[in-house]
Amino acid sequence: MHAISFTALLLSMLAAVGLTATAGMKALKDDFDTVALFEKGQILLTVVVLAVSAVLVQALVVRDFSYVYVRDYTDTLLPLFYAVTAFWAGQNGSFLFWYLCVALMGWCMIYTPGYSRLDNRTKVFFWILFFLVEIFFLFALTGPSNPFMKLDPVPAEGRGLNPLLQNPGMIFHPPLLFLGYAGYTIPFCLALASRLSGNGREWLELCRNWNIVAWIFLTAGIILGAWWSYMELGWGGYWAWDPVENASLIPWLAGTAFVHTAIVGRTRKSLLRTNVFMVALTFLLCFFATFVVRSGMIDSLHAFSGSRMGIPLLVFMIAVLSLTLFVCLIQRKDDSTHIDDFASRPGMLFLASWLFLCLGGIVLLGVMWPVLSSMWSANPVGLDAGFYNRVCLPLFAVLALIMSICPWFSQKHGIGDKTALGVVLGGGAGSAGIIFALGYTQPLALFSAASGFMMVVSIVLYFVRTKGARSFLPSWGAYGVHMGVALMVIGVAFSGPYKVEAEAVLNKGQSMTVGAYEVQFIELRHHHDNPAMDMHAAHLAVTRDGKAVGSLAPEKRLYRSFEQSTFAEVSVIPSLGEEVYATLLGFNEEGSVSLKVSINPLVNWIWIGGTLSCLVAFLCWRKIERR
């Protein structure tokens, strides 16, 4: 099956090249009556990638170690569920999964009402662009990122899946990111196709639902990745500003900026070229995120080593950027970049969009800083988390402030409801005063928390005072997303600067004090009944003011396939207030343990807010009538 699968991908690439060439020649001749051919071609390409993906999954399930990929990411002790998810654990499999998502979305596009509203000219340009994207994926899968390489002789055992990836967060985090990346392919191709065909306005409405879905997947992937970092790595935090973490954040920032400029574009019939550039930039940055992971230029916990995809990705990104600039430079009669007044709701949305882009630019600069600094330094260094916290967090707080006051500006000029705006500002000032009185006086955290509470007040007040919003489902979606963001802002404001942590070496029966909590070491238990690993758990009792709070059992695990390393499994006592978080750093034969215990205030507000934002965003979906 190795050769058959590889040949199928190779033939798919040749078919995509043929379809692109045919579409290009038809476009040059102004012949746009062969759209059905391209649609059938896309269906065929999708069926092929579904088939080869099934082959790889089957090989992973039965542990067919004649595949290099299966040998590298599974072993006979790996549970079936994790064997299936190993499909996207490595760079070759994840690239196949990404292409599978792109192909499936292309297939779905054919049957959407929005697609039926496109004229044939726009459809032909759409398929030219879409097939070009697929050609890149197929080139990668038949060249530097081939998941069907054969291994001879066949080993009796595989190398196993990294234990850090054997976690629910990492099972779903990568596919959600790839679904988000793939989702932006449709708006990108639709925007450029509409621009090239001269049908420059309708695409914004037609790609609305695609944009929402892509944003939801990307947001969910990032939130889940942060939760995985918090629950699996054992360092007590959720965002380390690691280059690969940042790389996935950059397209999200650009995509969020596009969400807001698209609103202005649809309602004010302006910013058409700006929106084309925004969606193309988001699409491009999805590949930049992959470039950071696979190029080997950036050092990161998450990066793949030894990848040959760096140069192909760089060439592809240059081609996309060049095409985007060319398309954006084409003048259209309906082009308008005019904002009537920045002291208006469209003006606030536009300002928020540019702040998102500025944040993306800062994070991009930080990611590339080791590469840039190598131009003038023999010892290039990256920027630490302190840089991002000092520069980015204040801008996020300003964005929260803008989101809280934006609903009270009118569509054309000035403040539409001064009374409501006064209540919102008063709510922010009042919450800041209460927070300060409670002893939380750190300036940035105080400003951020007050901005978050202002958002909550603003959203509740908006629905109280605006009857139309209460009866319009997309309003519930949009403001529900903002409510989730408000909860996240408040969670970040408290969980970062007000975290309390301590480390201690304890013997049986001894205790350590962490903030207002007393943590007592009860016993160390050893478990050897799992054939895949040995587990060593420290059982702890937690009290506060003499009253029992709960128990903890952080673990150290030694996996048979990774005996050179031990892996921590944290334990938490969940709370909407202060969460107690424990990591077992080590132990000795005498039974003493080394522990790290943290008290993380309001950290669960981040996960609740992120989940809320992802779920209610589906309410923003709007029905599009077929033509």
How would you describe each model-predicted region?
Residues 1-8, 32-35, 58-92, 146-174, ...:
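Membrane-interface interhelical loops and short amphipathic "cap" helices
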Residues 1-32, 47-52, 65-67, 243-253, ...:
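Contiguous transmembrane helix-bundle modules in multi-pass membrane proteins
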Residues 10-20, 94-226:
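A conserved hydrophobic secondary-structure block that centers on an alpha-helix together
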Residues 44-61, 136, 217-226, 285, ...:
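A generic, lipid-embedded transmembrane alpha helix
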Residues 49-78, 85-106, 110, 139-149, ...:
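Transmembrane-helix bundle segments that line or gate the permeation/cavity pathway
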